[in-house]
Amino acid sequence: HVGDGLYNVAFSGDVHYDDTRLFNGAVNDFPRVETLVMESTYGGRNDYQTDQEDSEEKLKEVIRETTTEGGKVLIPAFAVGRSQEIMLVLEEAMRKGEIPEVPVHLDGMIWEATAIHTTYPEYLRDDLRDRIFHDDENPFLADQFNHIDGGEDERQEIADGGPCIVLSTSGMIEGGPIMSWLTHVGAQSDSSLVFVGYQAQGTLGRRIQNGWDEIPMNDRSNSRGTLTLNMNIETVDGFSGHADRQGLMNFVRTMNPRPEKVLCVHGDESSVQDLSSALYHDFNMRTFAPKNLETFRFK
């Protein structure tokens, strides 16, 4: 609220219009709102995500194929949100016998972030909250989840062992323990690297997605300077914490009340401009695609 509340600005944050395994869909019912500042990560005209059910099936297929061959599945993931979403998929799939019961190793801040989700289940999706509160069934505490706390020695032991799944930060392969896992597992042709999140332009994750197999390690964890990737590279869309183009349009279409102005932010330049233009044409509202440090006066 600005001043006495005569002008009201809503910030979408990272918004997902539909329910996910972890959270209920975004709330877009407000007492008053004049301007909406909305993310545009997948706001491009061709940014449509795969249905989550299809995405889960593809992930399970990659896991089945890789573990059957004796390999390891390495999943770079954001510590908050994405990792817990994937954990729920893995726990259910193993419980139902849809994928082999192999260890799932959690590295980086994933364990700590998951503990926060477990501590505050009242903020989670309704049915997940009920499982934890009323059924005394916490999927995040399943036996297959293992916290990596032994450093490089433990990672090397796992890399030398049998089939497993590794969830590790950072989600865009820009540092963190994922670099160590690439060093240990990257040369294994029977293993798979699976992207389940957005890879921004300029990140190492995006370069690997685009076909790079000679990875500069920059003295992070590999004295050789570069690493040759022999792993299978897979991308599974549909797990993003961001709504796709249709979801963003639906968020505004069903918003109550509908804002007078929309500032499209947090996206590649083309995505921001595409979404801003689409909102203007579809809803006849004032829309903007701000540049960095551009200033707006609300009145």
Labelled PLM ranges:
Residues 1-85, 89-98, 103:
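His/Asp/Glu-rich metal-coordinating catalytic cores
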Residues 10-15, 37-41, 76-78, 106-108, ...:
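Active-site neighborhood of phospho(di)ester-bond hydrolases with catalytic His/Asp-centered motifs
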Residues 21-41, 122-128, 199-228:
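Short, compositionally biased "basic patch" segments
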Residues 28-32, 99, 184-189, 253-258:
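Short, conserved loop/helix-junction motifs that constitute active-site signature segments
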Residues 217-252:
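Generic long, charged, amphipathic alpha-helical segments
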Residues 250-280, 285:
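C-terminal structured "cap/appendage" subdomains that terminate the fold
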